[in-house]
Amino acid sequence: MIRQGLSSRRGVLRQSRTPFVHALVVYAQPPTSAKPGDEAIVLSDGTIEGFVGGDCAEATVRQQSLETLHSGETMLLRITPDVENDVVRKKVVHNPCLSGGTLEVFLEPLIPPPLVYVIGNTPVAESLVSLGSVVGYAMETYSGTIAKDAHALVVASHGKNEDEALVKALVEGVPYVGLVASKRRGADVVARLAIDEALKAKVRTPAGLPIGAYTAGEIALSILAEIVAERPSGVVGCYEGTRAVTTEIDPVCGMEVVVSEASLHSVHPDPDQNGLLVWFCGNGCQRAFLADPTAFAGARGHH
């Protein structure tokens, strides 16, 4: 994929709130197939679009990119055939399959900002949208649909269109659901919702932390603070849809390989292995294994 196409693709992914990693080659010591300026996009399923090197380099970029999606932190990745220690702000990976060259690739996870739906044309709703945007959240007016990655929904409409939105958000599992209302009115609204009690109990009303908020801006601030406080631990800046990266060892070269549909893998040809999946860094290792599996008797994998 040429750079112009890759740039357009990044725009499409950001518009659709799809998390990805931008991988950019910043250093190449020959012999390597990649050159500085080569780049790729790595999706959360391990798919790579673009070019950052051959099979073995690509396998390492895939694994470390998924690690950055999980952590939310950028990484300067050094891939080298030599054994080196990590240095400050640089992850060093020994790759025995490289043809003798060294690559450095900057990995930048691009994760959609938390999505918050707001209902209402009230001063509190307007202040919430304004403050949330400053914080870096994606603030949207609720229009009847809720994205699967929605982080919060806040009803600040003073009695208009409350029930349907609250029920929909609760049923669809939105992590934070808040209702701006007095304690008494909020309790009445929640009581009449046509859902079970366990879901009703998840409504935050009066929405916001008890900080003595009085003005619309202060109330909006208290709600944002509560949204932050309710955020699960360990997900600051990371993509919540990822799990810890699972890897297996390439039986031929000993490299770690991400267990992903995007990684090269084959069913072990020995029927006694009961369909064991064996994972490879590249085509060369895959061909070598399939040509003589008995030479790599210690192969492990997933069924």
PLM regions and their residue ranges:
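Adenosine-phosphate binding glycine-rich loop
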Residues: V180-G186, A191-V245
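Short Cys/His-rich metal-coordination motifs, predominantly Zn2+-binding knuckles/fingers
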Residues: C253, N274, C285
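Rossmann-fold NAD(P) dinucleotide-binding segment
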Residues: N161-V174
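Short Cys/His-rich "knuckle" micro-motifs
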Residues: S260-S263, P293
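Short cysteine-rich clusters marking metal-coordination/redox-active sites
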Residues: D250-C253, S266
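Cys/His-rich metal-chelating microdomains
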Residues: E256, N283-G284, A288
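Segments forming oxygen-rich coordination pockets for charged ligands
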Residues: M1-A152, E164, Y176, K183, ...
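Cys/His-enriched microdomains
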Residues: E248-P251, L276
